[in-house]
Amino acid sequence: MTYENISPSEAKSRMDTNPEAVIVDVRRPDEFVTGHIPGAINVPLADIQDGNIPLCLADKNAVYLIYCRSGVRSVTAAVALEKMGYTHLANFGGILDWPYEIEH
């Protein structure tokens, strides 16, 4: 398995220590605009499943920190990206469990 499940606090630590890490929100755009983690990019799960991967996810060796609303879609996204050859994936669940800053 190339992806790992980590806690929100571990994700925050990785964001703070690795500015190169890409924070990926796999919720729908209408969910993303209601509030998201600062610096996150919105790549809906449906796009990933359809193979519509944006340029911001072009580097399969980059570090990706993935989340959704409750943690279900983020696991699905991590598995799909893993099958596409991505090597550094971390799922930290849902924004519902995120105790830190949220950007609106």
Where are these regions (language model features)?
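Short, surface-exposed ligand- or partner-binding patches at beta-edge/loop junctions that are enriched
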Residues: 67
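Rhodanese-like catalytic fold shared by cysteine-dependent sulfurtransferases
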Residues: 1-21, 29-63, 72-104
